[in-house]
Amino acid sequence: MGNTSSERAALERQAGHKTPRRDSSGGAKDGDRPKILMDSPEDADIFHSEEIKAPEKEEFLAWQHDLEANDKAPAQARPTVFRWTGGGKEVYLSGSFNNWSKLPLTRSQNNFVAILDLPEGEHQYKFFVDGQWTHDPSEPIVTSQLGTVNNIIQVKKTDFEVFDALMVDSQKCSDVSELSSSPPGPYHQEPYMSKPEERFKAPPILPPHLLQVILNKDTGISCDPALLPEPNHVMLNHLYALSIKDGVMVLSATHRYKKKYVTTLLYKPI
C-alpha cells in the first residue's frame, strides 16, 4: 500500500532534508545558489586571476619606474685627470666607467695623461702598460673578491665647487646685452684717400739725445779700449747704422743685462 504525498512531505521535514526544485534546464533556482563573500580572502582569486593581474601589475611597475627615473636628476659629468708616471712606450686606461675598454693615453714629456668627463661617484680603473695590466701604487687601491687589485677614484661635487663658482661668475660677466657693439656716432662707407702731401712727407727729425750714440764717439786714450763708456738709457734697444764707408756698413745695438751694458757691432759688406 503506497504512501500519500502528504505523508512523504512529513517524513522529509522530519529528516531535515528538502529536495530542491529544478527548472526545465535541470539547474537549481537562483535563490538556492551559494553566496560568495566579497571580502573573504579565500574568494579573492575568483575575481582577481593571474590573467587579469599580470597586465595591470606590469603597467603599474612601468609607471613607477618612469616616476623614479624622472625624480632622479642626472649626475653631472666632471673633468677627471688620469696620469701614469711609471714610464713605458704605450699606455692605455681601462675602468668601470667605459666597460673596461682600452683608452690610449697621451704622452706629456715623461708622463701619460688623459682627461675624461666622469659622473660623480666611485670608479675603478687600471693601466695597460706595454702589454701588461698594472695599477698605480701611489693612488688609492681596492682589492676584489678574486684578488684583483684596481685603483679607485672618488669624483665628488665638493671638489669642483670653486670651478662652479668661477663658471657662474664668467656667465654673469659675459652678459653684454646692455653694452653697445660699436662706439656711438655716425658711420659711412667712404674709402680712405691718402693725400699727396702725406705720401711724400719727409721722415721725422731724429731726437737730439739719440745722436750721442757710441758709434759716433771716439774712445779716449785714458780709457780701456775693451770697455766703452756707459750709454744713456734712451739709447738702449735701438738699431743704429753708420754711413757706408769703403763698401762696409756698420750696425750697432745696445742692451742692458742687470748692471752691465752689452753693445753688439755688425760689419756688413755692401
From Swiss-Prot:
Lipid addition sites, N-myristoyl glycine: G2
Question: Any coiled-coil ranges, and where?
Answer: none
Write down which residues bear the modification named N6-succinyllysine. K201
Q: Name one GO molecular function term.
A: AMP-activated protein kinase activity
- Matches recorded under Gene3D superfamilies: 6.20.250.60, Immunoglobulins (2.60.40.10)
Feature: compositional bias, Basic and acidic residues: 9-36
Phosphothreonine carried by residues: T4, T19, T148
Residue(s) carrying Phosphoserine: S5, S6, S24, S25, S40, S96, S101, S108, S182
The keyword Kinase is assigned to this record: no
Q: What does the entry list under GO cellular component?
A: cytosol; nucleotide-activated protein kinase complex; nucleus
Q: Where is this region: Disordered?
A: 1-44
What keywords tag this UniProt record?
A: Fatty acid biosynthesis, Fatty acid metabolism, Lipid biosynthesis, Lipid metabolism, Lipoprotein, Myristate, Phosphoprotein
- Please name the InterPro entries in this protein's record: AMPK1_CBM, ASC_dom, ASC_dom_sf, CRP1_MDG1_kinase, Ig-like_fold, Ig_E-set
Q: How is it modified after translation?
A: Phosphorylated when associated with the catalytic subunit (PRKAA1 or PRKAA2). Phosphorylated by ULK1; leading to negatively regulate AMPK activity and suggesting the existence of a regulatory feedback loop between ULK1 and AMPK.
According to the UniProt record, where is the region Glycogen-binding domain? 68-163
**One Pfam match, by short name?**
AMPK1_CBM
Describe its function: Non-catalytic subunit of AMP-activated protein kinase (AMPK), an energy sensor protein kinase that plays a key role in regulating cellular energy metabolism. In response to reduction of intracellular ATP levels, AMPK activates energy-producing pathways and inhibits energy-consuming processes: inhibits protein, carbohydrate and lipid biosynthesis, as well as cell growth and proliferation. AMPK acts via direct phosphorylation of metabolic enzymes, and by longer-term effects via phosphorylation of transcription regulators.
Subunit structure as annotated in this protein's UniProt entry: AMPK is a heterotrimer of an alpha catalytic subunit (PRKAA1 or PRKAA2), a beta (PRKAB1 or PRKAB2) and a gamma non-catalytic subunits (PRKAG1, PRKAG2 or PRKAG3). Interacts with FNIP1 and FNIP2.
Q: Which family does it belong to?
A: Belongs to the 5'-AMP-activated protein kinase beta subunit family.
Q: What is known of its domains?
A: The glycogen-binding domain may target AMPK to glycogen so that other factors like glycogen-bound debranching enzyme or protein phosphatases can directly affect AMPK activity.
Per its UniProt record, what PANTHER family does this chain match?
5'-AMP-ACTIVATED PROTEIN KINASE , BETA SUBUNIT, 5'-AMP-ACTIVATED PROTEIN KINASE SUBUNIT BETA-1
Q: What is this protein called?
A: 5'-AMP-activated protein kinase subunit beta-1
Q: Which organism is it from?
A: Mus musculus (Mouse)
Q: Which gene encodes it?
A: Prkab1
